[in-house]
């Protein structure tokens, strides 16, 4: 299989890796979490006295910044390998602008979903979970080997989307069960929200791209 070039994909991978290296070499891990991670209670205004801290930027900015921070090297490596492979194929189909839209929308949706799930939580949310989930869904939709088939009253595309979503939810629940005992927190809400973004946006954006070509 020939790998598409994917310039935006390479840039996104490069940015994520560069930020990780700078944070860890500079010893800025704690500051990066405080300033860049998404803290649901901060976004909802439920921080209480802790909200008096002089943050660098408004809480809404962390809907994006959290997606460029990673807990450790294995977290970064896992996300970047998926992005490196799936991202360039989605970019091939949609073009760099629309692929970037899917990626950033997935990141924001993931952050909002985690906030809605635990609005008063002080646990920081880090990682490109929502963005990567959106790219995975886009890859599954745009490069499916078999044509979708209707299921009962459900049209083919909706039926396939529902099947993929159920599969994705099941996979995430299995991951949470398998790794939860090791203290690893799986951002299930972010994964699901990002995946839905990819399911919903990918084919309409593909049609839009070639309609305007």
How does the language model describe each region?
Residues 1-213:
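A detector for small-residue-rich transmembrane helices and their helix-helix packing motifs
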């Amino acid at each position: 299989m020939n790998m598409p070039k994917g310039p935006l994909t390479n840039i996104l991978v490069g940015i994520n890796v560069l930020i990780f290296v700078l944070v860890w070499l500079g010893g800025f891990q704690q500051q990066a979490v405080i300033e860049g991670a998404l803290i649901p209670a901060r976004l909802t205004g439920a921080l209480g006295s802790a909200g008096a801290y002089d943050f660098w930027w408004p809480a809404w900015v962390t809907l994006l910044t959290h997606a460029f921070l990673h807990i450790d090297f294995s977290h970064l490596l896992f996300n970047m390998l998926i992005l490196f492979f799936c991202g360039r194929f989605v970019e091939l189909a949609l073009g760099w602008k629309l692929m970037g839209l899917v990626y950033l929308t997935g990141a924001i949706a993931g952050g909002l979903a985690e906030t809605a799930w635990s609005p008063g939580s002080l646990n920081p949310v880090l990682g490109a979970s929502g963005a990567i989930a959106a790219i995975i869904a886009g890859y599954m939709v745009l490069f499916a080997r078999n044509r979708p088939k209707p299921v009962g009253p459900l049209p083919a595309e909706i039926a396939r989307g529902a099947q993929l979503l159920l599969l994705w939810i099941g996979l995430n629940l299995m991951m949470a069960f398998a790794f939860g005992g090791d203290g690893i927190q799986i951002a299930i809400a972010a994964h699901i929200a990002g995946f839905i973004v990819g399911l919903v946006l990918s084919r309409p954006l593909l049609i839009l791209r070639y309609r305007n070509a």
